[in-house]
């Protein structure tokens, strides 16, 4: 579900691009130092945004340097990096979230690659759970709730269509059918948002409530963006997807995502952010839309809508 919270490179100066890479590389080094070389596979730009956000908000002591990178052996020049205490926390979260993403993949299709990744990350997750037990417990709670929501909807949809082989259960009772028809398309997204909000709020002091609100909105956006991008694959496969269940078109998905993005932007605007402000703006206001605009180019959405102009996120 991650990989959407990235910067719009076209909106950044060269110095901002270098700063972005340095914080990203700092997170990569923190993963290596705290969890070993293999944990670098957990690296994401999503948590890089979190580091930028916390460093700007709290202005902690930051260590900077340059190191050769085994992940990028060419060019041979050392790569600049920047780290703070928030980088270490982001590394812990990266491992925990990646492990549960792998568990989700195993539950979905059980392929060998996912099972191998689960085994490789199990030890690292044990270490992360010792370091951030409350956060890991929250991730476990939320992911279990999401699996229940997604599984219930899949089974309900199959039973309503009479696909007993797919569900291995009898057709739904009248009450169960009514519940299936009245399903809440926001339920799973809300759970993911609640989880990310609580992770964002940890150790934020005075700003805990605002950071939780930001994380909650961003989490809902991430979940829904993942559903939008997977729409074409999930339609024939029958995988849980709230947009498929609702029969949404590109413009309907765009409008729903814009509301979720606004829910993240409102608390973000209330934070006293100065350092890296333009860089973070390029992530939250335009970069997060990159994969959607690639899957659903605005001009294609307009054609689908009969050519009528629509309000849309920045490209």
Regions found by a protein language model. Give the residues of each.
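Acidic catalytic motifs of isoprenoid enzymes
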Residues: 1-192, 196-213, 220, 224-256, ...
């Amino acid at each position: 579900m991650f990989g959407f919270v990235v910067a719009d490179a076209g909106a950044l100066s060269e110095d901002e691009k270098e700063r972005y890479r340095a914080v990203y590389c700092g997170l990569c080094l923190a993963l290596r130092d705290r969890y070993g070389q293999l944990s670098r596979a957990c690296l994401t730009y999503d948590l890089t945004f979190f580091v930028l956000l916390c460093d700007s908000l709290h202005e902690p002591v930051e260590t900077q340097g340059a190191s050769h990178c085994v992940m990028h052996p060419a060019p041979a020049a050392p790569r600049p990096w920047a780290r703070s205490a928030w980088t270490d926390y982001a590394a812990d979260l990266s491992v925990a979230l990646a492990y549960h993403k792998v568990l989700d993949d195993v539950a979905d299709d059980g392929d060998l690659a996912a099972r191998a990744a689960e085994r490789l990350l199990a030890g690292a997750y044990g270490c992360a759970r010792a370091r951030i037990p409350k956060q890991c417990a929250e991730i476990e709670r939320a992911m279990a709730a999401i699996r229940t929501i997604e599984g219930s909807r899949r089974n309900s949809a199959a039973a309503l269509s009479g696909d007993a082989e797919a569900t291995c259960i009898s057709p739904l009772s009248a009450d169960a059918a009514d519940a299936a028809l009245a399903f809440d398309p926001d339920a799973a997204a809300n759970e993911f948002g609640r989880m990310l909000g609580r992770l964002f709020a940890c150790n934020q002091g005075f700003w805990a409530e605002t950071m939780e609100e930001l994380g909650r909105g961003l989490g809902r956006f991430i979940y829904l963006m993942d559903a939008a991008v997977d729409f074409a694959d999930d339609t024939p496969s029958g995988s849980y997807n709230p947009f498929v269940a609702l029969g949404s078109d590109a413009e309907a998905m765009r409008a729903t995502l814009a509301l979720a993005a606004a829910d993240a932007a409102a608390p973000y605007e209330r934070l006293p952010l100065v350092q890296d402000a333009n860089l973070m703006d390029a992530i939250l206001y335009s970069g997060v839309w990159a994969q959607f605009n690639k899957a659903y180019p605005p001009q294609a959405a307009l054609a689908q809508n009969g050519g009528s102009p629509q309000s849309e996120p920045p490209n």
